């Protein structure tokens, strides 16, 4: 639009210059009596007036460019992968081919755009092949509450969530067992008595001697009964 206005202003000035040269020639040759000079004078004045007024015409600013100025770039970060962990959850909503790059540009918006009216967006563009480098350009500020975890959400790379400040509740933590030494001692004693009673009640005398020859023999050497209630007669 501004180039079009400048071209018209130049054309008007050139027209005025031509009229001024014609007027100069008439005055030089003293031909003003036979030819009217008023049209030339009016053309010169009109051309200068148009050229001066064209500079005061307001420039048209496109809505697209004004929107870009309002939503300024907040920052840029480079990463080796398109799934850059920056502490926010993003959702991909589009991609397109860029004239100045062989790689497509990916567009993301905050995952809380609808729930919390967050207008933050970002663009991901591959700027280098070997080694790969992806540039993340952030536009707008987050109006949502920043989550306590980071998210990978790079299109086909899937979505993986990592929560760094997660504390395991005490209810699911393994609890140490309380150990009562007296209780264990009583259980051991009860177990020993149970074994002895089992031997006295269910084993034959010969089998008991064959199974425990050393124990029975040792007790017999000291004049003790092998087991209370168990009579062993070896021939």
From Swiss-Prot:
Write down a Pfam family by its short name.
WRKY
One GO molecular-function entry: DNA-binding transcription factor activity
**DNA-binding stretch(es), residue numbering of this chain:** 79-147
Gene3D superfamilies in the record: WRKY domain
Sorted alphabetically, the keyword list is:
DNA-binding, Nucleus, Transcription, Transcription regulation
Tell me which stretches of the chain form a coiled coil.
Answer: none
Any idea where this protein resides?
Answer: Nucleus
Q: Which InterPro entries match?
A: WRKY_dom, WRKY_dom_sf, WRKY_plant
GO cellular component entries: nucleus
What task does this protein carry out?
Answer: Transcription factor. Interacts specifically with the W box (5'-(T)TGAC[CT]-3'), a frequently occurring elicitor-responsive cis-acting element.
Family per similarity comment:
Belongs to the WRKY group III family.
Family matches, as PANTHER family: WRKY TRANSCRIPTION FACTOR 21-RELATED
Q: What is this protein called?
A: Probable WRKY transcription factor 66
Give the species this sequence originates from: Arabidopsis thaliana (Mouse-ear cress)
Supply the source organism's classification: Eukaryota, Viridiplantae, Streptophyta, Embryophyta, Tracheophyta
Q: Which gene encodes it?
A: WRKY66
């Amino acid at each position: 639009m501004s180039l079009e206005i400048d071209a018209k202003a130049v054309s008007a000035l050139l027209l005025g210059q031509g009229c001024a040269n014609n007027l100069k020639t008439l005055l030089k040759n003293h031909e003003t009596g036979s030819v009217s000079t008023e049209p030339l004078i009016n053309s010169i004045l009109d051309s200068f007036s148009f050229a001066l007024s064209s500079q005061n015409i307001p420039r048209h600013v496109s809505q697209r460019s004004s929107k870009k100025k309002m939503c300024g770039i907040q920052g840029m970060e480079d990463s080796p992968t398109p799934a850059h962990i920056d502490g926010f959850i993003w959702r991909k909503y589009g991609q397109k081919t860029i004239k100045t790059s062989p790689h497509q540009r990916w567009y993301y918006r905050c995952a809380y755009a609808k729930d919390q009216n967050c207008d933050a967006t970002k663009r991901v563009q591959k700027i280098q092949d070997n080694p790969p480098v992806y540039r993340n350009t952030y536009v707008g500020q987050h109006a949502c509450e920043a989550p306590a975890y980071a998210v990978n959400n790079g299109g086909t790379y899937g979505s993986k969530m990592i929560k760094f400040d997660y504390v395991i509740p005490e209810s699911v933590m393994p609890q140490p067992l309380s150990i009562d030494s007296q209780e264990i001692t009583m259980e051991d004693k009860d177990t020993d008595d149970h074994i002895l009673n089992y031997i006295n009640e269910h084993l034959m005398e010969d089998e008991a001697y064959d199974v425990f020859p050393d124990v029975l023999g040792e007790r017999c050497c000291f004049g003790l009964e092998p087991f209370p209630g168990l009579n062993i007669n070896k021939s």
